[in-house]
A protein has these predicted regions:
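Short, flexible coil/linker elements and helix-boundary hinge sites characteristic
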Residues: 45-46, 108, 140, 161
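Substrate-binding cleft of secreted/luminal carbohydrate-active enzymes
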Residues: 118-124, 129-204
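Active-site cleft segment of glycoside hydrolase catalytic domains centered on the general acid/base Glu
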Residues: 1-82, 90-102, 106
C-alpha cells in the first residue's frame, strides 16, 4: 500500500503564474510534519502503507521552481519517507526521460521512484476536435466524427461490455502524424532504466 503526500504541488503551492515562486520552506516543513505524524499514526494503528512525497510534475520544465527542491529535500532527508512520486504528462516523446534523469542525477534521489500518473494528454489535447476522416469511414464511423466523440463512444461500449478491439483503437491514432509513435514502449523502457517501483497511467 502507498500513500502520496501532495498532488502536483508546483501548482498548489505557486505564488504566481510562472509556477516557480513559492513558499518552499513552509512547504518543506509541512511535508516533514505530515510524514512524521503519519508515521506515528501508522505505528499506533498497525498500518503498513509506505509514505511517498510528490507528486512532482514537469520537473524538467521548471528549473527555477522553489517547490521541487523542497519536496526532494524531504525525500532525501526524512527517514519516514520511502520515495518520490512523479507525474509525467510529456508533450513530446523525447521528454519521457527528462524528469527521471533530473531527479536522479541533479537532485541525487536514491530512494524509490513511483509514477502514479503518466499520459499523452498534452499531446492529445490540441487534437481532440480533429475529424476521424478516411479512417472513420473505413471502420464504420463517419468521416466527420471528432476524436473526442469517438473516445466517448468507445468508453460507453467498454462500460456496456462490448469494447472495440485494441487493433482498432491503436490504428486510429497511428493514422495521425501528430501521434507520438512508440509512446508506451518508450515510457516502459524509461521506467525500467530508472528502476521505477510502481506505475499507473492513463490515456488522457
Amino acid at each position: 500500500e502507498i500513500l502520496v503526500m501532495g498532488n502536483e504541488p508546483e501548482w498548489e503551492n505557486a505564488l504566481d503564474t510562472d509556477l516557480c515562486h513559492a513558499d518552499g520552506e513552509d512547504y518543506r516543513a509541512f511535508l516533514n510534519e505530515f510524514a512524521n505524524r503519519l508515521t506515528t499514526w501508522k505505528q499506533a494503528n498497525g498500518w503498513t502503507f509506505d509514505i511517498y512525497a510528490g507528486a512532482l510534475n514537469r520537473v524538467s520544465e521548471l528549473p527555477k521552481s522553489e517547490t521541487v527542491p523542497a519536496v526532494v529535500s524531504v525525500v532525501n532527508n526524512n527517514p519516514n519517507v520511502v520515495g518520490l512520486d512523479l507525474h509525467v504528462h510529456a508533450l513530446k516523446i523525447n521528454q519521457a526521460e527528462d524528469d527521471f534523469r533530473i531527479i536522479r542525477d541533479k537532485y541525487g534521489v536514491t530512494k524509490k521512484l513511483i509514477c502514479t500518473e503518466f499520459s499523452m494528454v498534452r499531446a492529445l489535447n490540441p487534437h481532440v476536435a480533429d475529424a476521424l476522416g478516411e479512417w472513420g469511414t473505413k471502420h464504420g464511423y463517419t468521416a466527420g466524427m471528432k476524436i473526442y466523440e469517438y473516445l466517448n463512444l468507445i468508453a460507453e461500449k467498454a462500460n456496456a461490455g462490448t469494447p472495440v478491439s485494441a487493433t482498432e483503437f491503436k490504428s486510429l491514432f497511428e493514422s495521425y502524424s501528430w501521434y507520438p509513435k512508440n509512446w508506451y514502449k518508450t515510457f516502459y523502457e524509461v521506467f525500467k532504466k530508472y528502476d521505477t517501483y510502481a506505475i499507473t497511467g492513463r490515456f488522457s
